A protein has these predicted regions:
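Short alpha-helical "recognition helix" segments of helix-turn-helix
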Residues: 1, 49-54
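DNA-recognition helix of helix-turn-helix
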Residues: 4, 54-74
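Amphipathic alpha-helical segment used for protein-protein interaction
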Residues: 2-31
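Short, flexible active-site loop motifs that bind/organize anionic cofactors or intermediates
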Residues: 10, 40, 51
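Short amphipathic alpha helix immediately N-terminal
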Residues: 26-45
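Hydrophobic positions on the alpha-helical face of helix-turn-helix-like DNA-binding modules
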Residues: 36-37, 49-51, 61
Length: 74
């Protein structure tokens, strides 16, 4: 699967993979949102693949990513 073009939130820009994982795990996110953030920003999966793995719709993943971005900047 080709890596998706992912625009990283400001809080994750310039971080390597390990630092990104640590930042996501330390953010105030729930279990599902943490998994979505890791799949999107660390694994760089496209939304349909994340939707398939989490059993949410692609649209729901998009909405959740918007709130995840806000939580990462807290």
């Amino acid at each position: 699967v080709a890596a998706a073009r992912v625009v990283l939130p400001a809080a994750l820009q310039g971080l390597d993979r390990q630092q990104m994982t640590a930042a996501i795990k330390s953010a105030p996110l729930g279990r599902v949102d943490r998994k979505i953030a890791l799949l999107r920003y660390v694994e760089r999966l496209p939304l349909p693949d994340i939707a398939a793995q989490t059993h949410y719709s692609r649209t729901a993943i998009g909405y959740r990513l918007k709130s995840i971005e806000k939580m990462l900047s807290v």
